[in-house]
Design a protein with these regions (language model features):
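A generic structural signal for well-ordered coil/turn residues at beta-strand boundaries
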Residues: 28, 55-56, 103, 150
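Left-handed beta-helix
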Residues: 39, 64-154
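Flexible loop/turn segments at secondary-structure boundaries
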Residues: 23-25, 50, 106-108
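A short, charged helix-loop
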Residues: 35-55
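Short coil/turn connectors at secondary-structure junctions
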Residues: 9-14, 56, 94-95
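Short, surface-exposed amphipathic charged segments that create phosphate/polyanion-binding patches used
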Residues: 29-33, 58, 113-117
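A conserved catalytic-core signature of glycosyltransferases
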Residues: 56-57, 62
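Conserved beta-loop-beta/alpha segment of the NTase-like Rossmann-fold superfamily
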Residues: 1-36, 61, 69-73
Length: 154
């Protein structure tokens, strides 16, 4: 099921695309704490002592109403950030946040070292991800239509 389908099935206000990372790297990410159903019970942005290794990929599906309200409320916050401000605000307001555990290709490029490593992997003799092989899948344009359903995405 796509994360768009999961959002609808769970009546989620926000769906967070996540991926397990090694525990020793979890403090570099926003981490998601969930219950048994995948409902987000807490979100910690780059915690010193993470309670989870389920890392946010920085990819979110919001209902327009919830996103708009959070952005309006946070507009005066300098350096407003989804992980530090928007997601915690949604949780505090009692919104339904769910995690979608992605199991495809994804690389963090948040540090110079990880950016370099991702580039080196792409030029490997047999890269883990081949853009030309996946061209149609990874070049879809995402559009917004009122009361629409997202049918395909990464």
């Amino acid at each position: 099921m796509s994360d768009a389908g999961l959002s609808q099935e769970n009546n989620a206000a926000v769906t967070i695309a996540c991926m397990p990372v090694p525990w020793e790297e979890a403090s570099r990410f926003g981490v998601v704490i969930t219950d048994d159903t995948g409902k987000v019970t807490d979100f910690e942005e780059k915690p010193a002592n993470p309670r989870s290794n389920l890392a946010s990929m920085g990819i979110y599906i919001f209902t327009w109403k919830v996103l708009r309200e959070a952005l309006i409320k946070m507009r005066s916050v300098p350096g407003c950030d989804f992980g530090k401000h928007i997601l915690p605000e949604c949780l505090e307001n009692g919104e339904r946040l769910f995690a979608y555990e992605y199991n495809g290709y994804w690389k963090d490029v948040g540090t110079l070292g990880s950016y370099w490593q991702a580039n080196m992997e792409l030029i490997d003799i047999i890269p883990e991800f081949t853009f030309m092989k996946n061209f149609g899948r990874f070049t879809l344009t995402v559009l917004y239509f009122r009361l629409s359903t997202l049918q395909r995405m990464l």
